[in-house]
């Protein structure tokens, strides 16, 4: 393929981002990668098909990119990702402007499909389902140079009643430890300091290939890689957290004292309808244990409101939990009715207006909690990774803050500070979600 201009639009989660980065690497040698789709002759849209709003965004983006065939330079429109895997037949009929359609297990066919279409105009439509394949290899990072996501497993075995991911991504399958370590070593050589481990469920890592959960061992091995400063864990199911994992987080200085626990709900009756393999008591006990064992740990969660049949009593129970437990970070999502899931067939679907009201109530409550938590940080000194400049101030994150979903720490410019540096900042003021501080050194004590 001649050096044709290619642009990739990546939608959805961090796991999708990794797939996009893998595709970019495959294309890089034979194509010129451009950021602006209006300049590209080949446009790739990596879609998300998880919830209704994500599907709408994906379809709107595909249609917008398709319009560039008439208004700009686009000759080939490639669509891939979870939406194509989930709605392969429907999409082909709905959007005839697509020239190539690939499922989540077909990225190895990307380059050849583009070549074939450019040569002959022959369209390609692949959507292989796989319970064994794992997309891995070299990537071109789309994150800042100092941070990178590393996927440690693919798929999911949980089959929650509201979620279509197992039907899209297949069963849970861990990557080999040596492959992950090789990837981390390569990333560290490129200057990456923060490694963010992701999967549909990171806490189950190793169960399928090693016969036991070995996330704690993986953390220990990654921490030995030269250049790695922070290791961050996302998507940790509370019921799968082991004592070994707690000990490793507690004692390993490179592992951020931060855990993302996607609990979704707290009422036992709702958890049961969701198909979650846990209980209110288990969730509360693990939160207490984490706080007792790991000093300064930050806990984040995501909640779903408006699940089918959610009563005022069940919602009040959720509000009471949020108020009493006071998690450091919290996101709320309205339940989305997904085709092919058993929850979509449940009776007593909740009105959208009620979902929105409940979402707002939780977020107002959490905003107050977050404001109080942040006030307690005034006077404290944190290591901060510098991310950029906004309105004449630097901003960055400490160990309590995951990229894009949590707050930031702002501080005045310092001529000795560069983006990507890890420096010390003393907190002087607090907001609901963000902190303000000064660079901490001998003179600012």
Swiss-Prot record:
Residue stretches making up the TRAM domain: 375-441
Enzyme class: transferase
Gene expressing this chain: rimO
Tagged with keyword Iron-sulfur: yes
Organism: Clostridium botulinum (strain Okra / Type B1)
Free-text function comment from the UniProt entry: Catalyzes the methylthiolation of an aspartic acid residue of ribosomal protein uS12.
Main location: cytoplasm
Top-rank taxon, per record: Bacteria
An individual GO BP term: tRNA modification
SMART domains linked: Elp3
Protein name: Ribosomal protein uS12 methylthiotransferase RimO
Cellular compartments annotated: Cytoplasm
Similarity remark: Belongs to the methylthiotransferase family. RimO subfamily.
Catalyzed reactions: L-aspartate(89)-[ribosomal protein uS12]-hydrogen + (sulfur carrier)-SH + AH2 + 2 S-adenosyl-L-methionine = 3-methylsulfanyl-L-aspartate(89)-[ribosomal protein uS12]-hydrogen + (sulfur carrier)-H + 5'-deoxyadenosine + L-methionine + A + S-adenosyl-L-homocysteine + 2 H(+)
Classification lineage: Bacteria, Bacillati, Bacillota, Clostridia, Eubacteriales
């Amino acid at each position: 393929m001649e050096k044709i201009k290619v642009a990739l639009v990546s939608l959805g989660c961090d796991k999708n981002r990794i797939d996009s980065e893998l595709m970019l690497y495959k294309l890089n040698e034979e194509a010129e990668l451009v950021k602006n789709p209006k300049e590209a002759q080949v446009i790739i849209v990596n879609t998300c098909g998880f919830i209704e709003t994500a599907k709408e965004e994906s379809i709107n983006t595909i249609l917008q990119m398709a319009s560039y065939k008439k208004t700009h330079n686009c000759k080939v429109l490639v669509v891939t990702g979870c939406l194509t895997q989930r709605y392969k037949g429907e999409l082909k009929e709905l959007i005839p402007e697509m020239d190539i359609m690939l499922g989540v297990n077909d990225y190895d066919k990307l380059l050849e499909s583009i070549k074939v279409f450019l040569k002959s105009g022959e369209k390609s439509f692949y959507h292989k389902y796989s319970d064994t394949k794992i997309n891995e290899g070299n990537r071109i990072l789309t994150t800042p140079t100092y941070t990178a996501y590393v996927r440690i497993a693919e798929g999911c075995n949980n089959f929650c009643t509201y979620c279509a991911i197992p039907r899209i991504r297949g069963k849970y399958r861990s990557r080999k430890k040596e492959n992950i370590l090789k990837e981390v070593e390569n990333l560290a050589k490129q200057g990456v300091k923060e490694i963010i481990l992701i999967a549909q469920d990171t806490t189950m890592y190793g169960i399928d290939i090693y016969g036991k959960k070995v996330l704690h061992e993986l953390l220990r091995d990654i921490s030995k890689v030269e250049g790695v400063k922070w290791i961050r864990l996302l998507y940790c199911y509370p019921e799968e957290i082991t004592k070994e994992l707690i000990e490793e987080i507690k004692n390993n200085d490179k592992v951020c004292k931060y855990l993302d626990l996607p609990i979704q709900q707290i009422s036992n009756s709702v958890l049961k309808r969701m198909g979650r393999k846990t209980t209110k008591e288990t969730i509360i006990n693990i939160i207490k244990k984490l706080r007792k064992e790991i000093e300064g740990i930050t806990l984040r969660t995501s909640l779903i409101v408006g699940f089918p049949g959610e009563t005022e009593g069940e919602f009040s129970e959720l509000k009471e939990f949020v108020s009493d437990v006071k998690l450091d970070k919290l996101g709320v999502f309205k339940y989305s009715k997904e085709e092919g899931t058993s929850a979509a067939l449940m009776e007593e679907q909740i009105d959208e207006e009620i979902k929105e009201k409940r979402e707002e109530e939780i977020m107002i409550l959490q905003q107050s909690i977050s404001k109080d938590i942040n006030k307690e940080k005034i006077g404290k000194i944190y290591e901060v990774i510098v991310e950029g400049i906004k309105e004449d101030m630097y901003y960055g994150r400490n160990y309590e803050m995951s990229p894009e979903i949590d707050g930031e720490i702002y501080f005045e410019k310092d001529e000795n500070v560069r983006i990507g540096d890890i420096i010390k900042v003393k907190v002087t003021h607090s907001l609901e979600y963000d902190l303000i501080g000064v660079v901490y050194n001998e003179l600012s004590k």
